[in-house]
Amino acid sequence: MATSTISARDDSPAPVPRELPPLLAQVRDGWRHRDGRTALIGAAACLALLAVLFRSTLVHFVQVWSTDQNYSHGFLVPLISLYFANMAAQYGPTRQVPAVGLGVFLLTMALMGRLATIVVPVGIASDLSFIAGLAGIVALFAGRDALSRYGFALAFLVFMVPLPIHLYTTIANPLQLMVSRFAAVILNGTGLPVLCEGNHLTLPGGVRMFVAEACSGMRQLTGFLALTTAVAFLTPRPRWYRLVLIGSAIPVALTANVARVVLTGWIMAYDPKLAMGTFHTIEGLLLMGFGLALLRAECAILNMIVEDDRPTGPATRPAPAAG
């Protein structure tokens, strides 16, 4: 009985080891060689030093992402960037020829940007300098080929950077006025008389509705830009397709916010209390869903155009004549 039990166990298949993600697999393979181990240790040391130098920048990121709904997607951006880097690692290891000159240049620019913000407190300079520092570490220890391959993953980190307040309001204020005017035209055209004064809409009965910055489209624009850029990168389509998809983030965000203001206007004309509190929150969720539906419809239309542009098949040659 014991012998049969042992033989049965011996005949059972050995468990298949789980494969590491490509990015981690490259790190593991690099650690097995002396040069690769030296490069990994140096990169880790530089990364730790960069985190210490930009500690206030990293804390600022977390604070803004946690408190400002315009940048609540910031927590996802580094994770998506890692996903893109893992995708790039699927193509195998790059030729590891450290680009010392380029790496030192990028790290020097990052350090200068960080020091400049101590003298002149311009937060975005430090934010972008941190990304430049990451690129410098890649170039210094992995080379130009690695920087080229993982360049998009690094560049995508730009979407986690909060805009300066002055720049944000410079963009948001015209969008507020644009959304207000378009919404007023639609409300008047659908039978609800509205007087538009800047970003204030006066409804029948003297009810006044204020189109706030949250309804300007900036909140959706920041998220949609990151989303459309990610989708464009993942979509195996022509370059013009990807550029159109990224550029459509602006009209999609504006259209969704105009629809929200129009819906709010009709509800406030019926009962202003219904447009407050919980409904306003639900309305924001519906707005995001509406924007995603617009993007999905746009992709469907663009896909039809791409399909129409594809050749129907290889040209057939006439059969050679007999004899």
What is each PLM-predicted segment?
Residues 2-323:
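Hydrophobic N-terminal alpha-helices or hydrophobic patches in metabolic proteins across all domains
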